[in-house]
Amino acid sequence: MAKVMMYSTGVCPYCVMAERLLKSKGVADIEKVRVDLDPPRRREMEERTGRRTVPQIYVGGTHVGGFDDLAALDRAGGLDPLLAAP
């Protein structure tokens, strides 16, 4: 299963929904980067993604986007193959 990394904050309902969706797909370990506690990592997120909102989710080396992007990818049938990649 591909490695999953999520930029998040302590109070973020979309982060919780993203984590719930990923866990329903069998993802046991999500690397969470708390950008509210680590300003340099927030800058890193903004530079890498061009976005300022959380969550920002990476599956393997692929930037999926936020929760709406993740859910849309799942509905389109693209999330399972992405997660299955080594």
Model-predicted regions and their roles:
Residues 1-29:
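Local sequence-structure signature of Cys/Sec-based thiol-disulfide redox active-site neighborhoods
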Residues 13, 40, 65:
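Short alpha-helical
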Residues 24-27, 51, 64:
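Alpha-helix termination/capping residues and helix-transition junctions
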Residues 25, 47, 80:
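Chalcogenol-based redox active-site neighborhoods
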Residues 29-42:
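Thiol-based oxidoreductase modules, predominantly thioredoxin-like and allied folds used
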Residues 47-53:
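Thiol/disulfide oxidoreductase modules built on the thioredoxin-like
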Residues 59-85:
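Non-catalytic, surface beta->alpha helical segment in thiol-disulfide oxidoreductase systems
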